[in-house]
Amino acid sequence: MRIYRISHFADLSGDGGRRASARWHHKGRPVVYCASNAAAAMLEAIAYIARGDPALLPSTFQLLEIELPDDVNREIVSLDWLPADWKQNLAHTRSLGDNWLQLQATAVLVVPSALAPDTTHFLLNPAHPELLPPGQGKIHIVRVEQYPFDSRLFEGQVRKP
């Protein structure tokens, strides 16, 4: 199966997770966030990185298409397991993700999207044996597209000076 990621770098190191907390982990933990389709990956970038402002989308962004073989072990987080307020309850989702990263039981954690109903995201644990060595494990990048955002997404918005 193919999964997608928006990133400055064409790698799966998880370095961004070391630098900043996100919905499913606390800062300091290497993790790679991916989406089930390119549109969902782009939506996440617009919502979280640019906060809806095209001026904040770096021109260095690229869309990574990643091969995730069916035989890679994964854990699936069902909506039934999450509290009703999971989208606002970052303490809960971050704790869940941190525990998954620490246990290293699977290489992939499949989670629901908070932005797009019926969409899933894939968290990759770059420290898991199935992903090692980085870039040479079972999961790998198959295509890179430079700055995939269409200018029509931001028509009519005023860019900040």
What are these regions (language model features)?
Residues R2-G17, H25, G52-P161:
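Active-site and NAD+-binding cores of ADP-ribose-processing enzymes
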Residues K27-Y48, F122-E130:
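Extended catalytic/binding region for NAD+/ADP-ribose chemistry, centered on the ART fold
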